[in-house]
Amino acid sequence: MMKLYIVFGFIAFSAAYVVPEGYYEPEYYPADGYESERVARASPAELIFDEDLADEPEVEEPQYYIRTRRSLQPGAPNFPMPGSQLPTSITSNIEKQGPNTAATINAQHKTDRYDVGATWSKVIRGPGRSKPNWSIGGTYRW
């Protein structure tokens, strides 16, 4: 209970403490940017009505940049789509297998001379959680 009174006393003291008026007043600089001519102890309201500030240069327009986003939607760039003519295809799948949730990633590269495939799978949630399984295989046609 005594700790509560001490904490309450600190809060009351900090709320009642008076800060001197000029203690937190920042120094303002003229609008032309010269730091050597400081306007000492001027309030923002006084600076607004200053005649020197009326001739401020115009503010430049912000520059906008457009970033093309990658997307998995059909027709998006940089991703092989199902049924496309690219020799490489990558598919992923997350599915529920009883009480377990399994993730699978398949990658295949097919040409007229060889086929290469890789598979990675892991049970990510459930009682059958384990280390990932992976396999890599390939065939070469003579």
UniProtKB/Swiss-Prot annotation:
Belongs to the coleoptericin family. The keyword Secreted applies. Residues 85-96 have a biased composition (Polar residues). Residues 1-16 form the signal peptide. Residues 17-70 form a propeptide. Strongly expressed in the fat body and the Malpighian tubules, and weakly expressed in hemocytes and midgut. Keywords: Antibiotic, Antimicrobial, Cleavage on pair of basic residues, Immunity, Innate immunity, Secreted, Signal. It comes from the Eukaryota. It is found in: Secreted. This is Rhinocerosin. Residues 72-96 are annotated as: Disordered. One of its GO terms (biological process) is defense response to bacterium. GO terms for cellular component: extracellular region. It holds the Pfam family Coleoptericin. InterPro entries: Coleoptericin. Has strong antibacterial activity against E.coli, Streptococcus pyogenes, Staphylococcus aureus but not against Pseudomonas aeruginosa.
